[in-house]
C-alpha cells in the first residue's frame, strides 16, 4: 500500500479506527454500510457481507494495527524492554521511495509501542514511530 493513514500517538491522542473483520479474517477500514453489506477500504474500496463479519475498534492501546519508522529515510531501534538503555533486538527502516518496514502493534504504554517484527517482540519509542490501523504490506 503506497499511502497509509499514519498517526503519531505521541503528538496527539489516537482515535480508535473502526475496522471490519471479514469472514476470512481480513481487516479493512469501515467506510459505511447498507442493510446487508459493509463498505470498506483495504487497498481499494469494496463491499463485504455483514453475515460472518464483525466490527472492531482498533487503537495502539488495544494492541491492534501497525507501527513504522516516523523519520523519512531513517530507522528506529526496537529495544528488548521499554528502555533505550536495553539491548537493541531489531530495527524498522523507512527508505525513501519504498514502503516503510512495519511491525505488528501489541500495545502502547508510557510512550512506548510494544511490537512484534518477524517473531521478535520488543519496544519502539512512540515519538520515533507512526501507528496505522492498515497493514503496510
Task: Kindly give the residue locations of the regions a language model identified.
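Boundary regions of SH3-family modules and the immediately adjacent low-complexity/disordered segments
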Residues: 13-68, 113-137
Amino acid at each position: 500500500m503506497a499511502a497509509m493513514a499514519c498517526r503519531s500517538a505521541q503528538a496527539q491522542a489516537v482515535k480508535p479506527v473502526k475496522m471490519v473483520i471479514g469472514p476470512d479474517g481480513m481487516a479493512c477500514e469501515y467506510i459505511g454500510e447498507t442493510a446487508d453489506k459493509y463498505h470498506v477500504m483495504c487497498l481499494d474500496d469494496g463491499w463485504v457481507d455483514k453475515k460472518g463479519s464483525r466490527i472492531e475498534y482498533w487503537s495502539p492501546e488495544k494492541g491492534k494495527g501497525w507501527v513504522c519508522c516516523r523519520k523519512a529515510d531513517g530507522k528506529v531501534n526496537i529495544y528488548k524492554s521499554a528502555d533505550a538503555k536495553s539491548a537493541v533486538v531489531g530495527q524498522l527502516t523507512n527508505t525513501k521511495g519504498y514502503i516503510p518496514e512495519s511491525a505488528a502493534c501489541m500495545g502502547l504504554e508510557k510512550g512506548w509501542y510494544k511490537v512484534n517484527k518477524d517473531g521478535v517482540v520488543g519496544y519502539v519509542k512512540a515519538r520515533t514511530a507512526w501507528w496505522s490501523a492498515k497493514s503496510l504490506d
